[in-house]
């Protein structure tokens, strides 16, 4: 029996969050127990978030991205300069988000090849519509979720230098 394909993405969880990713990388390097992890994230609030729920949500998203990378990347993220840390956080996001990879391989590549000076905001919606043929569950996602994911993708691309601005999508 053929298994139905589904995108497994955490892009609604936030952009690169480099500062927070550095902290999470350090926690991963410390090999904390689940109890120690919870203590650091929710009680000590090492990510400095307003609520324990926000801290847990961000930490979980970042952890899922970074756990796909080798520990050497965690060290580079934690100890490297801002540019290196941003690149490593982006690598983690790419490893975790096939949708992001495919968006870059198709939409962003086409924009570069055609020397487009900016991206239109609707390209994310069109991209998701195209991908819904591969994963029909995308049609069930809330419009607000799709929009938030697009905002996060454009913010990531700006943070890593592929776009100059998230306002004009240049």
Model-derived features: positions:
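Eukaryotic partner-binding/assembly regions in large regulatory complexes
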Residues: 1-88
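Helix-boundary capping/turn motifs
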Residues: 14-17, 32-33, 95-101, 127-131
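Positively charged, polyanion-binding regions of nucleic-acid-associated proteins
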Residues: 89-91, 95-118
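Catalytic DNA-binding helix-loop module of base-excision-repair DNA glycosylases/AP lyases
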Residues: 106-108, 126-127, 156, 160-161
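Long, low-complexity intrinsically disordered regions
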Residues: 108, 112, 116, 132-141
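DNA-recognition alpha helix
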Residues: 120-136
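Accessory, usually C-terminal, subdomains that scaffold auxiliary metal cofactors
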Residues: 139-170
